[in-house]
Amino acid sequence: MIRGFFFKFFFYSGFVLICIIFLPALIMPSNIASFGGKLSGYWAKFCLRIFLSTKIIVKGLENIDRSSKFFIACTHQSQFETFFLQTIFESPFFILKKELIRIRIFGSFLKKIGCIEITRNKISKDNVDFYERVKLSIDKKNSPLIIFPQGTRYDVKERPDFKKGASRIYNLNIKCLPVVLNSGSVWPKKGVMKSNKKLIISILKPFEIGLDGNVFLKSLQNKMYEELDKIS
């Protein structure tokens, strides 16, 4: 518990400092703000190592084809992946709930790197053309979109069904790269942080375009949970 307290104190203090240092990036090219995000990811890794003795292992880097356009479907157990994935992928952007955009300063950085907001569980004018905006953003940017098909953070042992949004993005003729993490075993959504653990990021082989949307979604969920069972 004490180690977790020190981790959170130093990590969030450092994160706030990074945000302050990179404030000028809000009026500069977006890649400057993206670099601030990457720096936050490395800071998270450093703090986990120093305060919780966490060993971070990344598997499957050979499955990343940086010459093609793709979106990333990632399991979501912790805040960790929102920071650390920015160290693996070049200037990624996210789909996120509208409430996050409204957070002062932090929301401005999210908008700057091209994050796409959605109003969850509600039909709105913004949601009607949502997937068109996703397609335009992916075509325009030379960086991947990251989504969390579970919809929100879940406990390590939970296996909720994936949301249909993943298949709708896949049906835009964009291949999908699955990424599986056991981050909740170290940095859970709720409860005490764990020390002396291995935090594994497993990058699976991509799903090429051409599958039926429902077939894709079922196969994606099965493969990701199968891998999650292995590394948990």
Regions found by a protein language model. Give the residues of each.
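Non-catalytic C-terminal accessory region of glycerolipid acyltransferases
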Residues: D65, V128-S232
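Membrane-interfacial terminal anchoring regions of lipid-handling membrane enzymes
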Residues: M1-K38, E62-D65, S137-K140, V215-S232
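Hydrophobic alpha-helical transmembrane segments in multi-pass membrane proteins
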Residues: F15-C19, I50, L145
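Structural element of the ATP-grasp superfamily
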Residues: C47-L48, L85, L110, I169-Y170, ...
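Catalytic core of membrane glycerolipid acyltransferases/transacylases, capturing the structured
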Residues: F15, C19-K38, R66-I123
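Conserved H-X4-D acyltransferase segment
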Residues: I2-F6, F10, W43-L96
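Short acidic-hydrophobic, aromatic-tinged amphipathic segments that line or gate anion-handling sites
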Residues: V58, I116-T119, I209
